[in-house]
Design a protein with these regions (language model features):
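A generic structural signal for well-ordered alpha-helical surface patches
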Residues: 53-56, 60, 111
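Glycoside hydrolase catalytic-domain groove-lining segments
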Residues: 1-39, 56-59, 68, 77
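Amphipathic, alpha-helical segments enriched in basic
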Residues: 33, 37, 42-45, 84-88, ...
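Aromatic-rich peripheral "rim/lid" segments of glycoside hydrolase catalytic domains that contact
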Residues: 73-159
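Residue-level recognition of short, well-ordered coil/turn positions
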Residues: 66-67, 121
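The substrate-binding groove and active-site-proximal loops of carbohydrate-active enzymes
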Residues: 1, 37-52, 96-105, 112
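Aromatic side chains
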Residues: 50, 54, 73-75
Length: 159
């Protein structure tokens, strides 16, 4: 997504509001299902350890893609005293997106961020213009038609 956005805009890209919601500490990855707002809800909840692996894999790839930074969503899980209040009643998974648990301890993916930062990664501009085989105007007229092909092209490039 960063490479495509950079290629279409010709501007640097910041990856923001990414990450994942986690299952309770010590529990494996799982799928939660519940009913809210007259509809069935389903959400994958990564184990804390699995999300740490994911974050550790994504951060260097963002650097390689030329992203100027990465803002994970979000700082801390909601305190349990707030779980019964809107919007957390309908969107249960939103309670658990934090880098920090309600008790103030860091989740493993926060440690993955710390370890990555310790490598002193350098932001570098990557020219993605060669990725496109259509103009931005052509792309935006039919994004679903172009996105899969351009992603496959990106993968063949060896990114």
């Amino acid at each position: 997504a960063c490479a495509l956005t950079a290629a279409l805009s010709g501007k640097p890209v910041l990856a923001e509001e990414w990450g994942g919601c986690t299952a309770p500490p010590g529990e494996p990855s799982q799928t939660w299902r519940w009913t809210a707002l007259a509809g069935e809800r389903e959400q994958f909840m990564a184990s804390e350890e699995d999300l740490a692996v994911y974050v550790a894999q994504v951060l260097p790839r963002l650097v390689a893609a030329g992203a100027t930074g990465a803002l994970l969503w979000c700082f801390a899980d909601y305190d349990e005293s707030l779980h019964g209040t809107p919007p957390l009643t309908a969107f249960r998974h939103e309670r658990h997106f934090g880098l920090v648990r309600p008790d103030g301890t860091l989740k493993p993916h926060a440690e993955a961020v710390r370890a990555f930062a310790a490598t002193s990664p350098r932001v570098r501009r990557v020219d993605w213009t060669g990725l496109l085989d259509v103009t931005p105007d052509e792309y935006y007229r039919a994004p679903a038609e172009h996105a899969v092909r351009l992603y496959e092209r990106y993968l063949r490039r060896g990114a």
